[in-house]
Regions:
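Flexible loop/turn segments at secondary-structure boundaries
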Residues: 100-102, 179-180, 207-210, 242-243, ...
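Short acidic (Asp/Glu) and glycine-rich catalytic loops that position anionic groups and cofactors
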Residues: 21-23, 59-61, 89-94, 203-204, ...
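Conserved phosphate-handling catalytic cores of large alpha/beta enzymes
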Residues: 206, 212-262, 267
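N-terminal amphipathic, basic-rich helices that act as targeting or association modules
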Residues: 2-5, 9-97, 105
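Flexible, glycine/charged-enriched surface loops at secondary-structure junctions
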Residues: 55-57, 170, 258-262
Length: 291
């Protein structure tokens, strides 16, 4: 009886604050309402993503996975939050740290590990590897291996949506390191000029490879970097699944009416940049433990 009653509850959660540029913070969501089933769903999926990454780590270290491998453990709330706010009709395009996004867009764990192990049962028949998952049926346009190369393609997806009068947005994710890539700002300028329904989503995990944001960017307030293209910016806690969900829901409506938004999702990766990164020369273990 108690178990049945507990499943009926709903709760309102206060969301963490935002940092904004050229957009009124007062119009942003301040709370989220959730229930037992959604909480269970969130925890289940985030734990599955974490488990996929940890198992992949072990398989790589045992020599069964070869080539490149970029893990996203620590960033599970970001992938899950996006999936709660977007539909399969909203194209999502990302970069090489793509396992969590792929899983949330319908690529099964069986397909993920088949691909990582180079088997024909993999998502790309074992030919793409870690950085090139995709799922055309669910609007997941893949991971890309070169920093920033997915962004102009994402702008093209946004253009196609507007051209075809679709009521959807293109979600373009990239890391803090890509914020210093020229093609990002070329794509942003075009999206702003034509008022395309694009969300520029920065997965700021604080490090581009082994270089801290403060050592790589003159302006470390990444949510302000769309200003030159006249794109409003917002920073949110990317470790809070409901903060991500509610902001992206708001952003989708905003982009459909007014054009692109520039969003910095503050997150953190527990592993190094890739499996070749010993992760001991540029940050202390205490930093990871504190997070």
């Amino acid at each position: 009886m108690l178990a049945r009653i507990s499943r009926r509850f709903s709760v309102k959660l206060s969301l963490p604050g935002y940092k904004t540029k050229n957009i009124d913070e007062n119009i942003l969501p301040k709370e989220a309402e959730t229930n037992f089933e959604e909480l269970k769903d969130c925890l289940t999926d985030m734990m599955k993503i974490r488990r996929i990454e940890i198992v992949a780590d072990n398989l790589y270290k045992s020599g069964k996975i070869r080539g490149f491998l970029h893990l996203s453990d620590g960033q599970e709330a970001l992938a899950k939050g996006l999936s709660l706010a977007l539909t399969d009709e909203d194209p999502l395009i990302t970069f090489y740290r793509d396992h969590g996004h792929a899983y949330m867009r319908g690529v099964s764990a069986h397909e993920i590990f088949g691909e990582l192990l180079g088997k024909s049962t993999g998502n790309a028949k074992g030919k793409g590897g870690s950085m090139h998952f995709y799922n055309e049926e669910t609007g997941f346009y893949g991971g890309y291996g070169i920093v920033g190369e997915n962004i102009p393609i994402g702008a093209g997806l946004a253009f196609a949506l507007k051209y075809k009068h679709k009521n959807n947005v293109a979600a373009i994710t990239f890391g803090d390191g890509a914020c210093n890539q020229g093609q990002l700002y070329e794509a942003a300028n075009m999206c702003s000029l034509w008022k395309l329904p694009a969300l520029f989503l920065i997965e700021n995990n604080c490090y581009g490879m082994g270089t801290s944001v403060v050592r790589a960017s003159a302006n470390t307030q990444l949510y302000t970097r769309g200003d030159n293209a006249d794109i409003p910016g917002i920073r949110v806690d990317g470790q809070d699944v409901f903060a991500v969900k509610e902001l992206i829901k708001f952003s989708k409506d905003y982009a459909l009416e007014k054009g692109p938004l520039w969003i910095e999702l503050r997150t953190y990766r527990y592993h190094g940049h890739s499996m070749s990164d010993p992760d001991i020369s540029y940050r202390e273990k205490e930093e990871i433990q504190e997070i």
